[in-house]
Amino acid sequence: MDIKKYEVLLAVVDKGSFIKAASELGYTQSGITYMMNSLEKECGFPLLQRSNKGVILTLEGERLLPEIRQLVQLNKRLEQDFSEVKGQIAGKVRIGCFPTIVCAVMPRIMRIFRDKYPQIQLDLVEENSVGVLEEWLESGFIDVAFFSRQPRYEYDWFPVKEDRYVVVMSKESPLTAYDVIKPNQLEGQPFFMYRGSDGIDADVASYFKKNKADLMPTFTSSSDYAVLYMIEENLGIGMIPELLTLHSEEKFPTITTRPLDPPAQREIGLAVNHYDTAVPAVQRFVQTVQKSVSNGTLII
C-alpha cells in the first residue's frame, strides 16, 4: 500500500482537478494521472470520474473516502511521532487563511515559528470564503483555519485578536468631516465591498443587517487591494478590516479611515478540528501563535 497515492487522491478530490492537485503537490499532471490510474488498478474499480463540476469521486470512491482520510491522517501522525521519539519535531502544517491574514500577519508568524521549529514546514493556502475554509477543515485538506469566528463553528477555537472594521475613503470625501461614521450615513453612497467566492464579506453583511442599514454595493471584488485602488480614485467608500489598513497606508497615501458607531469588529483566531488528537506539529503551531501574542513577541 502506497500512502502517497492516497494523499494524491485526496488532493485531487479536494481541488476537483488533476492540474490543481499537481500544482499543489509539486507533480506534473501526467504524474498525477499515472498515480491515480495505478491506484485504481490496485483497487480493481474506478475511484474518480469527470463531471461538469470537475473531477469527483465515484460511488465506490465516496464509500471509501472517510477511511482513506483517516488512514492518511494516522500516517501523518505516526511519522511525526517517530520524529518526536528521535528527539525531533518535524512534519508539515497546512494552514488555510484569509488573504488579509496572509499579507498582514503570516510573515511574522512564519519567522517566529521557523526560528523555533525549523524542521516543520508551513504550507499556506489562501481562500476568501469562510464556507470553503470550513469545508477544507472538516475534510482534513487543511490542518488549521486562520479566519474570523462565526456563530456556527463546531471546531476547537483559539482566539488571537479582536479586529475592528473601519470605513475607508479618499481624503477628498465629504465624510472625512466626521470623526465616526453611522451605518445610515453609508446608505446611498457608492460603496465598494470585498467579495468572497460565497458572497460578500459575512462579517460586513452581518453588521449591516444587525443595524438595519440598507446597503447595495456598487462594486465588488475578490481583492481587497482592488477595492482600495477604486477608493483611492474617490470613486466611492468601503468597509474593510483595520488589520489590512495598517499595512496599506504607505501604498495608498491619499486614503483615510474612520471608525464606525456602533463599532464593527470580528474575532480572528485559529480553528482546529479536534485539537487534542491533532498531530504534534499542528499543536506546536497553535501553541506558538498563542504564546507569541500573549507575551508580546507577536504584535498584531
PLM regions: where:
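Flexible hinge/capping segments at coil-to-helix
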Residues: 87, 155, 159-191
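Short helix-boundary/capping micro-motifs
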Residues: 11-28
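A short LG(V/I)-centered, amphipathic sequence patch enriched
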Residues: 40-57
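Central regulatory/effector-binding core of bacterial HTH transcription factors
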Residues: 90-152, 221
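Beta-alpha-beta core module
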Residues: 154-159, 163-164, 225-274
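Secondary-structure junction motif
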Residues: 190-211, 278-286, 296-300
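Alpha-helical linker/hinge and terminal dimerization helices associated
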Residues: 42-43, 64-86
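Conserved amphipathic alpha-helical core elements
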Residues: 39-40, 113
